[in-house]
């Protein structure tokens, strides 16, 4: 039975590429807009790729023993992906996160068997990170994933996402648009590609402006990610919270596609690019990191 999987880990990747014809026409895009639907991963986000790749890298490096405990400070999709992949592989996982994160995320990680330690909300992610580092310091069998610094993060896209895009388009890709979280998805295998990074307008650190509060989950961490390489990026576009959410809603209504808020930001940027005269007949691929269900209670 060739189409039967033996583990959820085998279901990560090979996500569909969808031509958003109605949305492109409605927004007068001269280019074809192709959405890489990462919410087709088993835990509904692009971070499933990163979670699995980080675990596999630890396995390949011989770092794991029967007492190994993976530790990560995260408030979002990476933690959920790690919880599911660790459950499938039989590993222990401890997640640290601020106490003011949504109950849905906390419950979902615990549902997969992860231990979730909540830190004071006033300490933000820095507090969660400090707690994770303390746990690793006290336990010689603990391994901290450090997604922002883990080479497996960009490798998940260099050897996965980007290859899939090139195969599915026959290499006919002119522009790649991605909202920037850890910046791993900006790693490509095509030197001729024009790469556009997207960040929140109120926290446009890639454009040299100060960090600030915003309402686009998963991106705009307030600092330049370690893997971000401006030599690989042709343009940085900043999108407002309202533009991101409005585009996500419009995509749902016109295409029946439940894209998340960061996907809305990336699509908004792609549609603006697609309206440029020189984009006529071009193909723009947009990374759609996750779906809207995880954010319905906060929009």
Regions found by a protein language model. Name each.
Residues 1-299:
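PLP-dependent amino-acid enzyme catalytic core
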